[in-house]
Amino acid sequence: MVWMRSAIVAVALGVTVAAVAAACWLPQLHRHVAHPNHPLTTSVGSEFVINTDHGHLVDNSMPPCPERLATAVLPRSATPVLLPDVVAAAPGMTAALTDPVAPAARGPPAAQGSVRTGQDLLTRFCLARR
């Protein structure tokens, strides 16, 4: 059964990679050159002309794939992060490396704290009902 699960994961990964490749790198029919967004109406002058031959979403045109992934917005921290991580991980590592099973002692098992016989229990219940 393990090989079946591995095969399913491999097929799913292959389909995902094929979908990404088809969306970005395979030739597409009737593809227009991507253009930047239209300028704001406050900056439009007489030079703005409506061009009806450029790509839009209704024309099935797609922008080109980005060259790289998006970068993080937050700046990198200059504080050392290793020390708090080590302090936080130390108790977990200690607990994982210790043996949680206590060694068994030789001899019969220890007696329970309060073991009662059946007659003692019946007497106790009868006295409680009176």
From Swiss-Prot:
This protein's UniProt keywords: Cell membrane, Lipoprotein, Membrane, Palmitate, Signal
Gene inactivation effect: Deletion mutant shows reduced growth in Sauton's minimal media and is highly sensitive to SDS and copper when grown on solid media. Reduced growth in acidic media (pH 5.5) and under hypoxic conditions, with decreased survival in hypoxia. In vitro, the mutant is attenuated for growth in PMA-activated THP-1 (human) cells. Mutant is extremely resistant to copper and shows increased growth in vivo. In vivo infected guinea pigs exhibited a considerably attenuated infection, and a few animals cleared the infection.
Induction notes from the record: Repressed by RicR. Induced by copper.
Topology with respect to the bilayer: Lipid-anchor
CC annotations in GO: plasma membrane
GO process annotations (BP): response to copper ion
Lipid-attached positions, N-palmitoyl cysteine: C24
Function recorded in the entry: May play an essential role in M.tuberculosis replication and survival inside the host cell.
Name recorded for this polypeptide: Lipoprotein LpqS
Taxonomic classification: Bacteria, Bacillati, Actinomycetota, Actinomycetes, Mycobacteriales
